[in-house]
């Protein structure tokens, strides 16, 4: 697999039991009734698709991963905010008697254990809400939940602007914001939530409200890091900025012989205390089952001038890469394949850890075991994506202005992206990955578990996603805005402590 250094981005404390891998089902509603139920309350532009329709797969977005994925009796594609509100109002008034579960889908990239418990649901797919309203006078842009990064990247670049986005062009824009949002501008603009000005939200009661620093301020704090727990966002407004370095970046990819892996790890460790704000990316450790050899790569994107990037490029080139590419590219286009994050329908499992430092010896221990395990198990495909991020901009925001997203001091966002042929291999893959996550956490982690909620598997616990100190406030808001726990299936806020 190719490495993508910026994710839509954890010790997982217990092994995955068989029960966690098995889904439970709700009482099934007849899909043929869905059109009769929702047809009268939706606008003509909205669509309803049933799995029995011959064109269902052509019209309904496939999820990125098949791991513990939800199942649906129907997909409703609202065309307006009014449609979303009507669906929610129906659930409030009658869904309990029909035992209907609803599941909102923005980009479908989330991978969570508990999604497997969402069965026979109605999928609210938001892809038709793909509007963009650019307001240059006020330096903001408002978008719908169906917008993908590529649409916003290209529009902003055409007018000399930027905002903090995740890295992949194919990924939904609003979805990652709700969990914080890491991307190539993190060291300069901070996480996505720092650029969020306001949002329109359909709540569990079916009301449509605005959340911002001046309206529903407490809820605005909560949706900036725990947003999936409080409703369906129907639009979001972001602050925009003049492009960094005139919109040009230095994109570099390096490949190394496996024998020099320790030198690569040592270099990453040397960056524990110094890292430029404009640089993002990191190492990818993988295994090629065709050549039966491991792969060591270092990919980076430097949002700045060639002169500022060169000292850092020199450090990497001094290791003697066997292949390299260094180019100037427009920031919004990128310069590398976006597989795997743009390839849907594979059996991906994603584990995440946020770390405070790098320890080369720990990485070496993992690499040696990983190569041995991969060589003996041709079904096992895993990328360790080890991303270094500058914390300057994120930590500069005053505490009173921050959202709930807690781990601004994390220097490393580490992801184990596992691909297996099918679910029968999940537990064996899990048994290999977990001990190394324990080791990473013990040696390179914080005193408490830090997990980036967008990339969390879902069994780590709310303290690891949202911060122990934030839970009392979050629980109170959950009780106020979603007392029946309709939202947040993947990384839920509890209704009590």
Curated annotation (Swiss-Prot):
Keyword Ribonucleoprotein: no
Residues glycosylated per entry: 99, 261, 288
Name of the molecule in the record: FAD-linked oxidoreductase fmqD
Upper lineage: Eukaryota, Fungi, Dikarya, Ascomycota, Pezizomycotina
The protein's role, per its UniProt record: FAD-linked oxidoreductase; part of the gene cluster that mediates the biosynthesis of the antitumor fumiquinazolines that confer a dual-usage capability to defend against phagocytes in the environment and animal hosts. The simplest member is fumiquinazoline F (FQF) with a 6-6-6 tricyclic core derived from anthranilic acid (Ant), tryptophan (Trp), and alanine (Ala). The trimodular NRPS fmqA is responsible for FQF formation.
Induction data: Expression is positively regulated by brlA, a conidiation-specific transcription factor involved in the early stage of asexual development and necessary for conidiophore formation. Expression is also induced by the cell wall integrity (CWI) signaling pathway that includes the mitogen-activated protein kinase mpkA and the transcription factor rlmA. Expression is negatively regulated by the transcription factor sebA.
A Pfam family it matches: FAD_binding_4
InterPro entries reported for this sequence: BBE, FAD-bd_PCMH, FAD-bd_PCMH-like_sf, FAD-bd_PCMH_sub2, FAD-linked_Oxase-like_C, FAD-linked_Oxidoreductase, Oxid_FAD_bind_N
Gene it is expressed from: fmqD
One cellular component (GO) term of this entry: extracellular region
UniProt organism field: Aspergillus fumigatus (strain ATCC MYA-4609 / CBS 101355 / FGSC A1100 / Af293)
Subcellular location: Secreted; Secreted, Cell wall
Top-rank EC class of the record's enzyme: oxidoreductase
Alphabetized UniProt keyword annotations: Cell wall, FAD, Flavoprotein, Glycoprotein, Oxidoreductase, Secreted, Signal
